[in-house]
A protein has these predicted regions:
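Alpha-helical transmembrane segments and their immediate juxtamembrane cytosolic regions
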Residues: 1-334
Length: 334
């Protein structure tokens, strides 16, 4: 099988496991527990990995006419983004009358500017990723129209950082798109480098990069939260750590012929289903408990219930959702 089926699905699986676990911890009020914050400090770069992967496996974003390309990206990303978001909103607002009746407030603040300021939906906040992914693909398509313009992507992390310093002014949370484009092109570049050198050379370089990442993340730790385009610590150190971690892990696991890891591999292979499904489940569980006057906040035992329950439900839903193109983005080829 191709390296993608092993290396990238393994890493995608780890990303999804980390993301769902993070959201469960936050829902249960355990997001600031010390041991968990350490986990986040060592895995903060995982969301950027999806953009890196898209660039690595890019077969040419400029091979199709612009109209056809936009339609294809709309079907694969924007329609699932809207569909998953609307489903989340239906679940969220279905419980709103009960919350107002019982607690005299909507539990979480509601505002009209949420519609244009953010790309997330009430009830399914992680959908921001699909919108940013969609915009990234479109921008890259037009960048590729101009020969040599792709190298401007080297400056895009700085653009995202400046936007962060100025309060992330772009609507629809588009401030992180520049980081997405940078990692998209980094994926393309790293694949090109890996093809030009021997497997043993890539293994050695990757090990050096991983060791450098481990050292630098201790000496000059910085973090980047892609969902809100937020930088913590030194900008240059954060970018260096992210590049070393992602390129090092991809280079190493691709070169050592990583064997198939059943559960993680499956989650990574069907990551879209887990991604769009888990958050509405968490809201449903939370609001059901609140409806009966019981909170899941600061209850560690709920973490041990929710994590296996969510993964089991998402796994059960894989064949169901993947047959629905407007949710999975898997449309029949004409």
């Amino acid at each position: 099988m191709k390296d993608r089926n092993h290396t990238f699905d393994f890493l995608c699986g780890l990303c999804i496991i980390r993301m769902i676990s993070l959201h469960v911890m936050d829902f249960c009020g355990m997001g600031e527990v010390q041991w968990w914050t350490h986990v986040m400090e060592w895995t903060f770069y995982f969301m950027s990995f999806f953009f890196f992967k898209a660039g690595y496996f890019n077969k040419g974003v400029n091979n199709s006419p612009t109209g056809e390309y936009i339609i294809d990206r709309t079907k694969r990303l924007f329609i699932p983004y809207m569909s998953a978001g609307i489903i989340g909103m239906i679940i969220y607002f279905s419980f709103l009358p009960a919350m107002l009746d019982k607690y005299h407030n909507p539990i979480e603040p509601l505002s009209w500017d949420h519609i244009w300021k953010t790309s997330s939906f009430y009830g399914n906040r992680p959908t921001w990723f699909l919108f940013s992914f969609f915009v990234t693909y479109l921008v890259v398509h037009f960048i590729e129209k101009v020969k040599g313009l792709r190298w401007i992507a080297v400056l895009f992390p700085l653009v995202s950082y400046l936007l962060f310093l100025y309060g992330n002014p772009l609507w629809m949370d588009a401030n992180n798109v520049f980081m997405g484009i940078f990692f998209f092109y980094l994926g393309m570049l790293w694949k090109h480098i890996m093809k030009r050198f021997s497997r043993s050379s890539i293994i050695i370089v990757s090990i050096v990069m991983i060791i450098a990442f481990l050292v630098l993340n201790v000496v000059g730790h910085g973090e980047y939260t892609m969902s809100i385009n937020s930088f913590k610590g030194s900008f240059l150190m954060t970018m260096l750590i992210m590049v070393l971690a992602i390129c090092g892990l991809v280079g190493f696991f691709s070169s050592v012929n990583l064997p198939r890891v059943p559960v993680i591999y499956y989650i990574g292979q069907h990551s879209m289903v887990y991604f769009i499904s888990h958050y509405p489940m968490l809201y449903f569980y939370k609001f059901m408990h609140l409806s009966f006057g019981r909170s899941i906040w600061n209850r560690p035992e709920e973490v041990f219930i929710l994590i296996p329950a969510v993964f089991c439900l998402c796994t059960w839903m894989v064949p169901l959702i993947e047959r629905i193109p407007w949710l999975s983005g898997r449309w029949c080829k004409s």
